[in-house]
């Protein structure tokens, strides 16, 4: 009997895909959480939402809270670290308002968002200028060009003060 025939016969012995899934041992919540955190950092709310989908009928829902506390105690789950990482990575493309919105979507508390954005304080005009220069060249000459750039920067979450500085060609904050 060939190797291919053996593999096919074993696969047919296991039944359908649904039957194979039922016999597959389920992962614990802790191992799922560690696997998710190994890929990228998560906020507590985001990880809780993802893990809640995997709580079985026979599992205690309070186990999720214990897993999150254990991960926090071991330093694997930190909303402060997550907020800082998101703020740093998004600061290359977005303004403070958009970063604040994204952090709120991830379930980060407003005080942690403010602390993460405080580390970026004073850089918004420079970041807006950088984003604008990647998309446009030179200073706008017509009102239509100014409006187009202002809409673009506003859609990226930059403040009006920063937008006006970019449109006027100022390099120093007022």
Where are these regions (language model features)?
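An alpha-helical, amphipathic repeat domain used for nucleic-acid recognition
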Residues: 1-174
